[in-house]
From Swiss-Prot:
Entry annotated with the keyword 4Fe-4S: no
Propeptide section residues: 433-456
Inducing or repressing factors: Strongly induced during sporulation.
Entry similarity comment: Belongs to the glycosyl hydrolase 72 family.
Glycan-bearing residues: N248, N353, N415
Disulphides: C68-C97, C211-C350, C229-C260
Protein name: 1,3-beta-glucanosyltransferase gas4
Gene this chain is encoded by: gas4
Active-site positions on this chain: E157, E257
Matching InterPro entries: Glucanosyltransferase (IPR004886), Glycoside_hydrolase_SF (IPR017853)
GO MF annotation: an example: 1,3-beta-glucanosyltransferase activity
Residues bound to (1,3-beta-D-glucosyl)n 1: Y86, N156, Y296
Pfam family, one: Glyco_hydro_72
């Protein structure tokens, strides 16, 4: 019997010998720096995977796909309680999939952005417009009725190096999204940010999202962190350092992506990922500060992180790494009691600007054209292929049509720092100095001409 057949035979033994997901979902609420089940009052730990077949820039909405129920059965085998979805079509019907997930005890953390709707790293002020906010608000409307929506991400890795300029507008988006939920949803749905693990500004960025007025602060914060590789340890991986750094952080923290793949390679050319960090993540050392995490990623893509192979006939085949992760989840219980969470804490102090961190404490006001959506609702959802907010030198994204090009999808890197995003703009955030000067000059010239034209 081949290795693949042995793996599949073990898989078919079913969840009876492994940890089962609870077969119901109640809204998740936040108390102090932790998540709790609103009905049972038990602490909730995220045990999940990142779920976007085709990659994070795929046009396929997995929550509207006919294949969702197949995947839910596999999630149940894996023993998870949460999936993260990077992109959805807000005009599609998600009832069947969301209900199937709920019946399996599985929650969804949803990124509100798409490859056509996000804050541009290069032109954040221009991409923050009515087209963009209408899309985000319409996505909230499409999902606010599902009790198993754990939360929304207002951004993913918009900052992935030392240039943090765009983060001011992401925090403004966080404020706007929270305000929209408060006005138009029957329940509070938490809103947070998923950060790249950039050592130079890791702390400043986290504190920035947790400082200022409550209406502007994130409800939770997450890292895409790949520091633990293979058979590592709390010390070698830096996990102990992260615990110390965030010991006084007052909102829930979790790993929105984890699972290094720079490890020993199997004979089938796939990485041998032992997932030994699972025991650490759900240990008494971690749970006073962190509330679990999501393994990157469900489906096999060219980047070699996938747990499940989806063939051309849409059939699923689990990998050795899937079986390994399933066993690690099964043998690692959550800590008893409340896991040492902090019942009350103080918001962070807004970090000072420096050569490695630059953001405004005073946030920009919501665009005038978007205020009608805040007041009266987003209106008709326009879907992934609807108008884009992306800006080019001849289009500011604030009209009903866009000339913006689709950015090329990015795969996960093979190093320990994640850089997944929807490119967040038409130009790279790592432009050369001369390129930045040229862009700045063109912007200034364009705005001058625009103002002159409007004045005329």
């Amino acid at each position: 019997m081949g290795v693949a057949n042995i793996i599949y035979a073990l898989f078919l033994l079913g969840p009876s010998i492994f940890l089962k997901a609870t077969a119901q979902t109640h809204p998740i609420v936040i108390k102090g720096n932790a998540f709790f089940d609103s009905k049972t009052n038990e602490r909730f730990y995220i045990r999940g995977v990142d779920y976007q077949p085709g990659g994070s820039s795929s046009l396929v909405d997995p929550l509207a796909s006919r294949s969702c129920k197949k995947d839910v059965e596999i999630f149940k085998k894996l023993g998870i309680n949460t999936v993260r979805v990077y992109q959805v079509d807000n005009s599609a019907d998600h009832d069947k999939c969301m209900n199937a997930l709920s019946e399996a005890g599985i929650y969804v953390i949803l990124d509100l952005n798409t490859y056509r709707h996000s804050i541009s790293r290069a032109h954040p002020a221009l991409s923050y417009n009515k087209v963009y906010l209408q899309h985000l608000f319409a996505t909230i409307d499409a999902f606010k009725g599902y009790d198993n929506v754990l939360g929304f991400f207002s951004g993913n890795e918009v900052v992935n190096d030392e240039d943090t300029t765009a983060i001011t507008w992401v925090k403004a988006v966080t404020r706007d999204v929270k305000a929209y939920i408060k006005k138009h949803s029957d329940r509070h749905i938490p809103v947070g940010y998923s950060a790249a693990d950039v050592a130079e500004n890791r702390l400043q960025l986290a504190h920035y999202f947790n400082c200022g007025d409550e209406s502007e602060r994130a409800d939770f914060y997450a890292f895409n962190m790949y520091e633990w590789c293979g058979y590592s340890s709390m010390t070698v991986s830096g996990y102990y350092d992260r615990i110390k750094e965030f010991s006084n952080y007052s909102i829930p923290l979790f790993l929105s992506e984890f699972g290094c793949n720079t490890v020993e390679i199997n004979d089938d050319t796939t990485p041998n990922r032992p997932f030994t960090e699972i025991e650490a993540i759900y240990s008494h050392d971690m749970t006073p500060v962190f509330s679990g995490g999501l393994v990157y990623e469900y489906s096999a893509e060219p980047n070699h992180y996938g747990l499940v192979v989806i063939d051309k006939d849409d059939e699923r085949r689990v990998s050795r790494n899937f079986i390994t992760l399933m066993k690690q989840y099964a043998k690692t219980p959550n800590p008893k009691g409340d896991g040492g969470y902090k019942k009350a804490g103080s918001p962070s102090k807004c970090p000072a600007n420096s050569t490695q961190f630059n953001a405004w404490e005073k946030l920009p006001e919501m665009p005038e054209g978007a205020k009608i959506y805040m007041e009266k609702g987003a209106g008709e959802p326009l879907g992934i292929e609807g108008p884009t907010n992306m800006w080019s030198p001849f289009h500011d994204g604030d009209d009903d049509e866009s000339t913006s090009r689709r950015p090329k999808p990015k795969n996960k890197p093979s190093n320990v720092t994640s850089t997944t995003s929807y490119t967040s703009g038409m130009t790279s955030s790592s432009e050369s100095g001369s390129s930045k000067i040229g862009v700045a000059f063109c912007q200034a010239l364009f705005i001058t001409v625009l103002i002159a034209t409007l004045s005329f």
